[in-house]
UniProtKB/Swiss-Prot annotation:
Disulfide bond positions: none
GO biological process, alphabetically ordered: NAD biosynthetic process
Example GO molecular function: nicotinate-nucleotide adenylyltransferase activity
Keyword terms: ATP-binding, NAD, Nucleotide-binding, Nucleotidyltransferase, Pyridine nucleotide biosynthesis, Transferase
The species this protein was found in: Clostridium botulinum (strain Langeland / NCTC 10281 / Type F)
EC assignment: 2.7.7.18
InterPro entries per record: Cyt_trans-like, NadD/NMNAT, Rossmann-like_a/b/a_fold
Function per UniProt: Catalyzes the reversible adenylation of nicotinate mononucleotide (NaMN) to nicotinic acid adenine dinucleotide (NaAD).
The name this protein goes by in its record: Probable nicotinate-nucleotide adenylyltransferase
Signal sequence region: none
Catalytic function, reaction form: nicotinate beta-D-ribonucleotide + ATP + H(+) = deamido-NAD(+) + diphosphate
UniProt cross-references to CDD domains, sorted A to Z: NMNAT
Lineage of the organism: Bacteria, Bacillati, Bacillota, Clostridia, Eubacteriales
Pathway stated in the Swiss-Prot or TrEMBL entry: Cofactor biosynthesis; NAD(+) biosynthesis; deamido-NAD(+) from nicotinate D-ribonucleotide: step 1/1
Sequence similarity: Belongs to the NadD family.
């Protein structure tokens, strides 16, 4: 069976931690492909200011262009309305029903995961993978959440440690506003694109 993963995010901007997570997932889950999906209009970030979708899409495209096992999809940014994860996963599952799908997202989603639209269907469609920038030290809240989901949905959440790179898009945006160096946080072409387009000032 072919294994593929969807790595969703706002990618505002994409940075080396995103790339590192994708490479880690390739090896750990024996993936043929990781599909980066820039978020369109996620319901949990509806009131947050975001860089226009076509600009975020272009940054992701530049970041992954040399890796043949990485691809990008504009499914969410071209879809109307709110970008629900269920709709995205359903779209890819219907396109490739025989593929074993993984969905990769950050640890912050754990706190509201059970409130996601059609979460039970999401667990049926894919293997759920959560990564943490801080590393997984059997935190009490994570243990409780794992048990709760296992009991309620009979599904095991997979975890990845992404603590090797302490980077966040928020941190990068703030450093740019403060006039600090950020080139070492992202692929060179993304950094040059940000400078050329005067982003995050």
């Amino acid at each position: 069976m072919i294994n593929k993963a969807i790595l969703g995010g706002t990618f505002d901007p994409i940075h080396n931690a995103h790339i590192n997570v994708a490479y880690e997932a390739l090896e750990r889950f024996n993936l043929e492909e990781v599909i980066f999906i820039p978020a369109g209009n996620p319901p949990h970030k509806i009131n947050l200011k975001k860089t226009p979708a076509h600009i975020r899409y272009e940054m992701v495209k530049l970041a992954i262009e040399k890796e043949t096992r990485f691809s990008i999809s504009d499914f969410e940014i071209k879809s109307k309305g709110l970008s629900y994860t269920y709709r995205t996963l359903k779209h890819f599952k219907e396109k490739e029903p025989e593929t074993n799908w993984y969905f990769i997202t950050g640890e912050d989603c754990l706190s509201y995961l059970e409130h996601w639209k059609y979460i039970d269907e999401i667990f049926n469609i894919c293997n759920f993978v959560i990564f943490s920038r801080e590393g997984f030290k059997e935190k009490e809240e994570i243990i409780k959440k794992k048990k709760s989901i296992l009991l309620k949905y009979r599904k095991e959440i997979l975890f990845m440690d992404a603590s090797i790179l302490d980077i966040s898009s928020t941190k990068i945006r703030n450093r740019i506003k403060e006039g600090k160096e950020v080139s070492f946080y992202m692929p060179d072409k993304v950094y040059k694109f940000i400078l050329q387009n005067n982003l995050y000032k």
